[in-house]
């Protein structure tokens, strides 16, 4: 359960599978509620599940910040996490 009323800044770290697609969908919903959202994707875009691809394309069309996690932007990810109110892990799902 997340208290979206009392939190403004969100970082969502998503994988490229279906759980990651759920995270990208969450980013869309939080943005629609006026929240500041940054998305960090772990994995290769070309390996995204269909669910992730659909939500990724919607995020791009909405101009929501999406970043591919690599060695060059790890410090940016760390900085964003420190400034956020909530970090959501959408890398791995349950099996």
Each language-model region and where it sits:
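Glycine-rich phosphate/dinucleotide-binding loop and adjoining beta-alpha-beta core of small-molecule
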Residues: 4-13, 18-95
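N-terminal glycine-/serine-/threonine-rich phosphate-binding loop
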Residues: 1
């Amino acid at each position: 359960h997340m208290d979206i009323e009392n939190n403004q800044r969100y970082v969502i770290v998503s994988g490229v599978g279906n759980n990651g697609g759920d995270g990208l969908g969450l980013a869309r919903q939080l943005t629609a509620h006026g929240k500041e959202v940054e998305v960090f994707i772990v994995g290769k875009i070309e390996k995204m599940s269909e669910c992730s691809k659909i939500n990724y394309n919607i995020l791009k069309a909405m101009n929501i910040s999406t970043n591919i996690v690599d060695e060059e932007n790890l410090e940016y990810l760390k900085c964003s996490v420190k400034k956020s109110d909530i970090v959501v892990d959408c890398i791995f799902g349950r099996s």
